[in-house]
A protein has these predicted regions:
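Active-site loop segments of alpha/beta catalytic cores
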Residues: 4-229
């Protein structure tokens, strides 16, 4: 495919091969392939795409069905290169669309992805997403990576143990500008709620202090020591 030969695509595939060779025996290699809703924002423009979903929902579905093939193509190439897990960002966020929109346009597509890919999938949607978490929990995805705009406890309640949660340490305030104690407090909040995988809520600001990232792991270790004592 010409798509897979594009330099922007090849550099990711080649990077995964290098990571797999150097670190594959020690840590999971996690790839990333954008979902069709996010791709549609880039292809059509956010406003045009969202207005079109109101004016002609059938055309929107046809667009998503075509765009999802790029999600598969890129994702499968990463798996072939050595990715053990794939993150699927698909930004049907509560800031832009309703939970009902998610159910109508994306739930079935995400369920199909969970069946079609051969590795575990982590769905990511930024923003306020509690109203669509019950639908996400039914997709068969292995985990949902959620934003700090949703509290850990309400997120756990919303998914009702039907899907693992990943998150949701705040990036722009806590990790970027606060200290390690603040990071550990958020780690404790997540663990006390039952969140299974503790991680930053989204892409980490490049100037985040390394000690704040290390504090995530230290917070987990401290929590385990306290709960076992």
């Amino acid at each position: 495919s010409d798509f897979l030969e594009h330099p922007d695509v090849k550099v990711i595939i080649d990077s995964i091969k290098i990571l797999k060779k150097e670190f594959g025996d020690d840590v999971p290699i996690i790839g990333k392939t954008m979902g069709p809703w996010t791709l549609a924002y880039h292809v059509f423009g956010v406003e045009t795409f969202l207005l079109g979903s109101v004016d002609d929902p059938n055309e929107t579905m046809r667009s998503l069905e075509k765009l999802k093939e790029f999600t598969y193509l890129f994702g499968e190439a990463q798996v072939d290169a050595g990715a053990d897990v794939l993150t699927v960002p698909d930004h049907a966020t509560g800031d832009l669309v309703s939970g009902q929109y998610y159910q109508t346009f994306l739930q079935d597509i995400h369920s199909e992805m969970a069946e079609r890919f051969t590795v575990p999938l982590i769905l990511h949607i930024c923003g306020r997403t509690v109203d669509r978490m019950p639908y996400i929990a039914e997709t068969g995805m292995h985990a949902f990576h959620f934003d700090s705009k949703n509290s850990p406890q309400e997120a756990m309640d919303a998914v009702d143990n039907k899907i693992a949660l990943v998150g949701n340490i705040n990036n722009p305030e806590t990790l970027y500008s606060k200290d390690t104690d603040d990071v550990k407090k958020e780690v404790f909040d997540c663990l006390n709620a039952g969140v299974q995988l503790i991680a930053p809520e989204c892409a980490i600001p490049l100037k985040t202090k390394a000690e704040n990232l290390v504090a995530i792991n230290e917070g987990i270790t401290d929590w385990l020591a306290e709960t076992k004592s």
